[in-house]
Each structure stands twice: as C-alpha cells, then as structure tokens.
Amino acid sequence: MHILMIGLNYKTAPVEIREKFSFQDSELPQALHQLRQMKSILECTIVSTCNRTELYVVADQLHTGRHFTKTFLADWFKLPKDEFTPFLTIRENDHAIEHLFRVVTGLDSMILGETQILGQVRNSFFIAQEEQVTGSIFNHLFKQAITLAKRAHSETDIGQNAVSVSYAAVELGKKIFDDFKGKQVLILGAGKMGELTAKHLHSNGAEQVTVINRTREKAAELAKRFLGVDRPYNELTEAIVEADILISSTGATGYVVTSDMVSHALKKRKGRPLFMVDIAVPRDLDPALASHDDVYLYDIDDLQNIVQTNLEERRTEAEKIELLIEEELVEFKQWLNTLGVVPIITALRTKALTVQGETMESIERKLPNLTEREKKVLRKHTKSIVNQLLRDPITRIKELANAPEREEALDLFTKIFALEEELAEQEKQEKVKQAEQEWLAKKRPITCMEKQSHVMVKS
C-alpha cells in the first residue's frame, strides 16, 4: 500500500492554470467515484480550494497510482497531460502524509497559519467518507490530521497576529480604543482594501459604518453590506466630525483629506481621538495630519511594517507546529506499520483455529459418546490453549512492525509458521472484494448532492 498526493497549488501554478483544475463541491461525488474506479486506486479524497487542487490516494503500486491519477485529471478536465504535468506536485508515502499535515495546519497556505483550510480539508474528507471511497488508512489519516490542526492552533499562537494589511489596521485601532463597540467608522472610497478593513472592524464590534465615494451608487452598495449608510461626497468634512475611525482607499492622485479640512473638524470634536488609516497609493491623507493632537495617522508602510513583524512571529510559532507534525508523522507510521502486520496475524489465527477445529473433530470421532456439554467444555479449553499460545507471538509481531529489520523479521515469521497459503487466500479474497466494490460503484445510486446539482443545472 502506498499513499500519494498529486496536485497543484499557488506555489506551482498561476491562477489561470489553477482555475482550470477546480472541483465544485457538487462535482466531488462523481469525481471521487471516477477516481476510485481507476486501476490501482484503493482509497481517495480530493481537496479543492482557490489556492490548491490536491488528489490524495491510497494505491497498491506507486507507478500505476501516479499514472492513473494523472489520467483521471486529464479525463475529467479534458486536457492533455503535457499541458498540466509541469505544474504538478507529487508527494509519496511519508512526504505525502507530511504534506497533508502541513496543509491542514496552515503551514502551506498563502497566509501562514490561516484556519480556513482546516474547514476545507474536513469538508473534503467528510464528502469522501459519505461516498464510501475512503477506507481504514484515510479514515485514520484524515481524522489524525484534523485533530493535529486543532492541536496546533490551541497549543501555539500562530493565529494571534495579523498578517494582512486590512487586519493590521484593526490591531492598531485596538491600541487606541479599548472597544470598537459604538464607534463610528467612515470609509472613504469603495476600494477592496477599504472594504476588507471595514469588514474586520465591523466583526470586532464597530457597528456604525458610513461610506463616502465620488460615485454614490458604489457607496450605497458597500454601505448596505455593513448595514450602514452612505453620504454624498460634499459632506465629507461633516462626516469627519462624527467619525472615530476613518479608512481611506480612493484612487485619487492628490490628497483627499487635507490638514486644513481636519483642523476645522477637530474644533467640533471636543478632544475625541480620530484614528485614520490611509491604505491608498498614492496617499489620500495629508501626512501633516499627524501633527494634530488627538489624530492617529497610519499609512500603508506603517501597516506593512506591522505585518512583517507579525509574520516573523508566526514563523516562530510555525517552528513549534513543525515539531508537532514530526510527532504525528511518527505516530501515524507506527499505526500504519501495525496495520501492515494484520494480514499475518489474521493468517496465524486462521491456521491455529483450523488446527483447533480439526482436533475437535478428531476427538469427537474417537469419543462418540461425549455429551454436548462435554464437547462445549472441550471447545472452550482447546480454544483457550490456542489463544494463550498465540498471545506472545502476536505481541512480538506487533513490536516487529516498527523495528528497523521489519521486512526480514516479518518474512522469517511467515516462514516459521508456514503462513504462505493463508496469506495467498487472504489476498485472493481481497481482490474479489475489491472487484465487487468496483462493480457496485459503477451501479451506485445518484447521491443527494448530485441530485441537487442536477436540479440546479436544469433550472
């Protein structure tokens, strides 16, 4: 058994490539079953976000697993392999497991340590589970990965410091105001950065939002998102009088808010502090504003400096998570190795119980006058002898599962107990079971998610 990750992300592929390889949640059931039906694929999960599309599979062979996973991508997206192969990242076994752990903890994200990816991976896994395309390996692996991510964010401070310009403005504001509740936010311009900053302020308690923009319709549209109000551009000075926080991100080429304008407003504010954030380039707010008492002015460079400092702090926290990942990787490998000896343990039990059964049949033939109670007692005690004899070998083989000489030791164990025939029969039954599952997958009923998707397409 081998674990593979094949995919592309923001590091390896530009957005014009990534957008061609994106799965909608409604497409995942069909995609998962199509991938699972590919030769060599035993289990699978697909993680698809705006920054990555990654296919995780359990394959019986590495080379066929790689080949048929790429074939699935080519078939699904109807693109030749040579068009996307240069952008692919491939991770195998330990490296695939470690990669998943880094992804789910946010260490591989564009914004280091972000938590949104945890929900996205969890959702992808739940869909795969619901579609019954995961098995014992991925059920264990993804549950462990999700638990690791929760542990990483509870045991470290990686998510505590702002690493976006918009959220850095909120951090600065908290140094001036103990609480944003009841504070008036004035957004000057309807730009994306201003909107993001307002969103963070609003989620931190700033409920009263006013938007001013040269195009009134855009101002009204943005104000509506925050249950705020829009005002005409010629009321800017009056709006500054009422504001506690001003966020400016217009596309103007000169200063939109001048020192003289604020001087008039300050006379009516009676010493209330005014927090001003200039996200625009070129700047909207006259740098001379910083000379006024009760005015706290910050521009894009100030915010970038905060972001850079916080990034360094996050990198320090990320090192702690790397240690957690190492621990979890060792733990999963030990579990996986133990899982690998299950067929040998099963074969040993099968052989021992077969001998016990044959012995009981021989006893019953030679002692035909045994009562049912006597037979029951004999079965119980002979089975007890078998279990006692097997206890030490089974304990030892579980220990050998994680020993350096694992392969040689397991091979010797198999030969000593002559388990080749039992293992061959297990393998045969497993192939029959796999063939039945593949046949059932092709005959499977349409899922609720697919029905909803079909209805949406028709409508």
Swiss-Prot record:
Substrate binds at T49, C50, N51, R52, S109, E114, T115, Q116, Q120. The active site is at C50 (nucleophile). InterPro entries: 4pyrrol_synth_GluRdtase, 4pyrrol_synth_GluRdtase_dimer, 4pyrrol_synth_GluRdtase_N, GluRdtase_CS, GluRdtase_dimer_dom_sf, GluRdtase_N_sf, NAD(P)-bd_dom_sf, Shikm_DH/Glu-tRNA_Rdtase. Gene3D superfamilies: Glutamyl-tRNA reductase, N-terminal domain, NAD(P)-binding Rossmann-like Domain. It comes from the Bacteria. Keywords: NADP, Oxidoreductase, Porphyrin biosynthesis. Its EC number is 1.2.1.70. Pfam families: GlutR_dimer, GlutR_N, Shikimate_DH. It catalyses: (S)-4-amino-5-oxopentanoate + tRNA(Glu) + NADP(+) = L-glutamyl-tRNA(Glu) + NADPH + H(+). The keyword NADP applies. NCBIfam families: hemA, PRK00045.1-3. Possesses an unusual extended V-shaped dimeric structure with each monomer consisting of three distinct domains arranged along a curved 'spinal' alpha-helix. The N-terminal catalytic domain specifically recognizes the glutamate moiety of the substrate. The second domain is the NADPH-binding domain, and the third C-terminal domain is responsible for dimerization. During catalysis, the active site Cys acts as a nucleophile attacking the alpha-carbonyl group of tRNA-bound glutamate with the formation of a thioester intermediate between enzyme and glutamate, and the concomitant release of tRNA(Glu). The thioester intermediate is finally reduced by direct hydride transfer from NADPH, to form the product GSA. This is Glutamyl-tRNA reductase. It comes from Halalkalibacterium halodurans (strain ATCC BAA-125 / DSM 18197 / FERM 7344 / JCM 9153 / C-125).
